Amino acid sequence: MTNSSTPRIAIVTGGSRGLARNTVLNLARRGVASIFTYNSNEPEAEKVVALAAEAGSTAIALQLDVGDTSAFDAFADRVRETLADLGTDRFDFLVNNAGISHHNSIELTTEEEMDKVYQVNFKGVFFLTQKLLPLIRDGGRIVNLSSGLSRIIVPGSAPYGALKGAIDVLTRYQAKELGPRRITVNAVAPGSIQTDFSGGMVRDNPALNKQVADMTALGRAGVPDDIGPMIASLLSDDNRWVNAQRIEVSGGMAI
């Protein structure tokens, strides 16, 4: 059941900050409503809601720890309730963005550290998508966030990079299995971006920022507005035939 006046709706994880925040706002400018998650920073989530309203769209913030799979059933119920409030029972787009960083050598990485990265960056993506599949419209779109580190080898990033590589493979499996429903699935792999991710490592460290710029063909580190429009574009009808792809958005990093 769908009201003909209902806008297209995206679910975006981690939308209170960084790349997902930028994605929510780019979607808002295109007339797409968002249900986005935040883990703990409700004030920042409320700011995103207000900015989306200024852009003439709707954004609704729901709390979710994507590393806690036991919360996914209750979250799916809240999504159903929110969709009903919006006059529909389906959403159109899913952006699996939320994640955590990890920096440690293979020798020193603990089992606890590895489990945490796996829980949030892979297991959470797998099972949250599974829980939401009954609610996504046939012909919808899914974008998973990968990373340049699934291609570029940076010592100290093995668990993070390997699990983003797993996201690349999962994306192709999802695209194959969801093909009969005409749901496209792609991965967007950002390069080094100036956000608060990983403690603002690229944004706030001038030496690292310069190092990234020097190894990037376009001569600078990325910013959120280099990524959000790409994700929003990939969800549009213009890219309806793009499927099962890993699309690196890095300005030509390490080529």
Across the structure, where does each feature detected by a protein language model lie?
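Conserved glycine-rich Rossmann-like NAD(P)H-binding loop of the short-chain dehydrogenase/reductase
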Residues: 32-46
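Short, small/polar-rich loop/turn modules that mediate ligand/substrate recognition or access, typified
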Residues: 179, 184, 242-244
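Residue(s) in the substrate-gating loop at a strand-loop-helix junction
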Residues: 147
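Conserved glycine-rich cofactor-binding loop
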Residues: 16-17
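Substrate-binding pocket helix/loop in short-chain dehydrogenase/reductase
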Residues: 91, 105-106, 110-118, 212
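C-terminal helical subdomain
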Residues: 187, 210-242, 249-251
